[in-house]
Amino acid sequence: MIDIALLRNDPDLVRENIRRKYQDHRQPLVDQALELDKLNREAILRADTLRAQRNSLSKEIGGLMQKGKKEEAEAIKQQVRDLQQELADLETKESEYEAGLREVMLQIPQIMDPSVPLGRDDSENVEMQRFGEPLVPDYEIPYHVDIMERLKGIDLDAARKTSGSGFYYLKGDIARLHSAVLSYARDFMIDRGFTYYIPPFMIRSEVVTGVMSFAEMENMMYKIEGEDLNLIGTSEHSMIGKFIDTILDADELPQTLTSYSPCFRKEVGAHGIEERGVYRIHQFEKQEMVVVCRPEDSMMWYEKLWQNTVDFFRTLDIPVRTLACCTGDLADLKVISCDVEAWSPRQQKYFEVGSCSNLGDAQARRLQIRARDEEGRRFIPHTLNNTVVAPPRMLIAYLENNLQEDGSVLIAKALQPYMGGRERIG
């Protein structure tokens, strides 16, 4: 949610930002917000005037009563009652204007960083950098489910019976490898100075609207029937929600957090759920990183966060690249974002395994997260998030890049302590 002062002072900037996102259907929101803001400020000004009149008349009534002028006092009392009624009506209007303004403001996208490349959708995202040499094997790399089945590590048929499409049973060495990756990711981030959390896996609707756009809510979130609770789509949701209605002191910034959670997603939209695979599913586990920092530091942290993910994958010898998300692919709350993609030897192309985002003050403004500098002045901090690793999607890249011609899979040195010292499976 953008600052209302920005909208008042530079509405053309807001309109241009909407145009760059190819969301011209949202242009009317700017005028709607300006009109509601005008009406609300007029109502506040009128209410302040009425309160001053009421207070003045109330003092006058006291003086008249002391002088025994009851009839004059009664006439003024009626004026006060009339003012009270008008004031009550105005306060009702104020509440309506404020609620309407907030609803409109929540739909206006965050102002993007000028460096975000122009583009309509993810097909126009721009490659930033590549890390590692892509593997081109001289033997066939099977589909990831086939690799897992040969290693007796997955049961999709049983999952379909219990839960439907988009779920899986992992077992044996594959389940152990899955856990090893997450344990290594936890320790990797702790070693980089991040505080480890296991957060709540359900959050209230107030937090949901604070951390994501309406479109993301509809496409992602599962709501618990009969409860004001929603299953999280990523631990970022509950980790940012942790600071709702909080004022952080200067010495508490930056907050550098890493969190583990299962993630639950409806995956409504163009891509949908795979019938036979673990790339796009309803339930998975993830290690996340979250930062709350001073506004002037957020771009520095943005660079650090995506580099953490690149470094993590490179310790596992998985080639990766980073892609700058274009304006049309950027979610409404994001200032700038990039995807981290891993190399698929089977497909001979990269595929997404994580996403790093700087959300500026959008989430903090929605959730009333504030900070106080050394002089006691308040400001709104910035929030960022990034995927460390999200198996089983990451396992697709790992298995393909470490599959041997004999069907076994090498265990990277970094993972061997979490796999009982084993050097390969299969």
Regions found by a protein language model. Give the residues of each.
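TRNA-recognition modules of translation machinery and tRNA-sensing kinases, especially anticodon-binding
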Residues: 130-426
